[in-house]
Amino acid sequence: MSFRVTQEDILSIPADAAALGLEMTMRIAAGPSCQRIADAGGEALRAAVRRVRFIPLGSAAEAELSALPFRHLLLTGEPRWLNGKCNELLVLRHCYESVFSLAESLGCKSLVMPFLSALYFHFPKEGAVHIALTQAEKAGLDVTFVADTPELLALSGQPYRRPEIVSYVGYYGDHALFELDNGLFARVDLRPELTEVSVIPYFEACYRTGNNPLQPLLPDAEVARLRRIYEESD
């Protein structure tokens, strides 16, 4: 529906639900907004988190708690940035998808949360903010993001620089692969009726052009078409 970014106190923002990130140890993430809620919830919040027991990375769950100014408190397992080759970007996107889906299933119309993984999990901040805003645009509720630093607030208002294609790697099956300038790879669907693009951290040798003598090379015009699909994608 809509989103906005603010630096207000997260507890002062009217919303049906709030969402927090959790570390793999099920501790509340160390960001200022997360800790603000943790301090307000006190031992009751810590007990509610323990009752949840475990949340897989990228998933979300509700913590049953009435001591906060929200009807629902949602938790999600935040990913850490390791080396960019462990599906970190995909997992972070799943965090938002899971949180928004759970909030909608609970009947929420509004949600407040910090930017996940953007401060203490070594994520590239620009990418973390971009994923948050892109997923919020698709959500069926009003989302308020609390930017815990001036840098995050500034990034939320800047155009996102899409990673540029460095080279065409090859294709396998229904997908072509392009190397990006951030060390990741863009996989683009070859089928004309589809315009699907996904970013992946690695590629298998089968994608390398010329490694399969039975696989014909793609015409330059087709490679150019696939490149345009990537450049025009979200």
Which residue stretches match the model-derived regions?
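Short linear proline/tyrosine/threonine-rich motifs used for host-factor recruitment
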Residues: 176-180, 185-188, 197-199
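N-terminal acidic leader/helix
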Residues: 165-170, 174-175
